[in-house]
């Protein structure tokens, strides 16, 4: 099978997993999607007040869905004496929940006043704090993926190495003081993405497809890992844009142009982040 056909097939699987994720009929998922849409709108509109209200709700709502599914699985196990529909254990649930707690801390840090400070050093300090919290969150993702049988492959690592190097280079230009935190977090994120791309995660025991459904949540793991990289790469792009705009001393028209691009980048950061977290969490807990 050609590489193009493989990529097309994987993209279709990712779309199917996303469709399943957004059509869950559970209050926590409906609320998560609503809060995510509001967060994207707030980023585009530069509404810090709305961001401070809705963004801290995202990770708790995802965690609520994880815990709800764990309770449902436990009830089914008590009735049938087995759990044939899921490989998720209590340890997995605890790890995912802990990772979401770390991501929540990162969200709170990154929406602080330093994230839009005029001084790039203030932005760098905020970025360092957020990166530290998100590194802990990625460690949880890595632990769950390894527990589910994922392994790093040479190809997956090689494909992500240039992206990591580009991120480090961008951080060195845009936020030199945040370079250690960004480099460490970027490495953890690259490992998460590489593990999530392991095709063995898309299979059940004995090598059979996990469910046979094109919308199986495990098939959203690889796209989720890629979207996470895109989201965080755009954060660095925003920092670089701000630094270039400040050093260029653009006039009023140029400043408006920079602001418009920055708003678009900020909204895209939120959109890709909301989807990435959802796909990873669904794939890791079903």
Question: What would you call each of these model-derived segments?
Answer:
Residues 2-286:
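Polytopic alpha-helical membrane-helix bundles and their juxtamembrane interface segments
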């Amino acid at each position: 099978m050609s590489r193009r056909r493989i990529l097309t097939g994987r993209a279709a699987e990712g779309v199917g997993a996303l469709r399943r994720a957004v059509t869950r009929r559970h209050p926590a998922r409906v609320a998560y999607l609503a809060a995510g849409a509001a967060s994207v709108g707030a980023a585009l509109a530069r509404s810090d007040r709305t961001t401070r209200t809705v963004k801290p709700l995202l990770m708790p709502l995802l965690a609520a869905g994880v815990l709800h599914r764990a309770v449902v699985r436990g009830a089914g196990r008590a009735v049938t004496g087995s759990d044939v529909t899921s490989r998720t254990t209590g340890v997995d649930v605890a790890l995912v929940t802990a990772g979401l707690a770390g991501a929540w801390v990162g969200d709170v840090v990154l929406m602080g006043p330093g994230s839009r400070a005029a001084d790039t050093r203030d932005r760098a300090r905020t970025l360092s704090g957020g990166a530290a919290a998100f590194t802990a969150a990625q460690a949880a993702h890595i632990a769950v993926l390894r527990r589910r049988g994922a392994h790093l492959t040479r190809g997956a690592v090689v494909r992500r190495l240039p992206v990591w190097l580009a991120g480090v280079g961008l951080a060195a230009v845009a936020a030199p003081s945040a370079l250690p935190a960004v480099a460490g977090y970027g490495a953890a994120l690259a490992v998460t993405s590489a593990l999530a791309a392991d095709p063995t995660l898309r299979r059940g025991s004995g090598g059979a497809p996990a469910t046979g459904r094109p919308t199986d949540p495990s098939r959203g793991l690889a796209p989720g890992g890629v979207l996470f990289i895109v989201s965080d790469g755009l954060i660095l792009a925003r920092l670089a844009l701000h630094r270039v705009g400040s050093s260029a001393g653009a006039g009023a028209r140029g400043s408006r142009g920079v602001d418009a691009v920055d708003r678009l980048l900020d909204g895209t950061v939120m959109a890709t982040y909301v989807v990435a977290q959802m796909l990873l969490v669904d794939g890791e807990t079903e």
